[in-house]
């Protein structure tokens, strides 16, 4: 239409702008009687105001007044679907919050009882599965509680954290367990895939004229699909510097625009980045006979790696400590519980004696490498001989396995199903 100048000149352009929240509230008051008659319910004034405010804040892909009208319509329809004995006569703020949380896929504003229980025990639950990293767990849980209590910044993500420390100490595991316990999605990106400049566009989508323009960005699509999630950017120091420029906007304003101009909302997302920067400086041996603390050297390496504007937008830089001998026995127990769960499916019960636990703790402990050598020791000395027995040997039909240490090696004692009964 606008290409034909002569035709355009004969028309006057009138822009129909999106109404303000107050104007939308007036529109809803005018429509209220129609919806009340249709759904056979009443809407309180506070419910209408909540529909306007919450839809404006959390439903980003539509405009006022349409999205506010959809919310009150859906709230009424939701009551009509209930049995007559459970129907409410008046729709209140809590009903509107529930509908908006379903549409926007975020947790409801008023915290439910089950949600409260999981938040109350979140710290304890995380410390039961990740050992020796209490500071990191305390920081993460306090950010989650602050956000759910409504005291966080409404325009920013739940939290932006940089986890730094040596390999194998639980940086990724803390994040994975947080998502698992909270019952929310874990969105994980390995930043070693985004080392080149052209790969950065995969996160937000290719620009017009480039291959893949019709496909959305991996990051923006994932957050649009799961607006309440934990976003894990693993080994972020390997990413191209342009990725950090993208993250500046996300950490400050909680939104990221994709190649189609659609905004992804990060305000209900916890952003966790992990890095090994500074780990080698922290694990440097001390000079002389006295033990020296090199944790400040690790922070110096992080300052060199990340720009001041990036560090300034982080809520916290959390230094993960190397695992000590006191913690490693609990790590042994964790691996044994996992093995027990795997064997239970095969009808095999497991008994690991204290001597075997001590042997595993001694041979699987490496302060520089964390918990990963333990997994390799268990695989080499327990799982490898066990695989033969499970497939072709004495445990093919189930049974009982006792593991003990003798003469600096592990011994396996097999008892078949018939012997146990």
Report the location of each language-model feature:
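AAA+ P-loop NTPase nucleotide-binding core of proteostasis motors
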Residues: 1-421
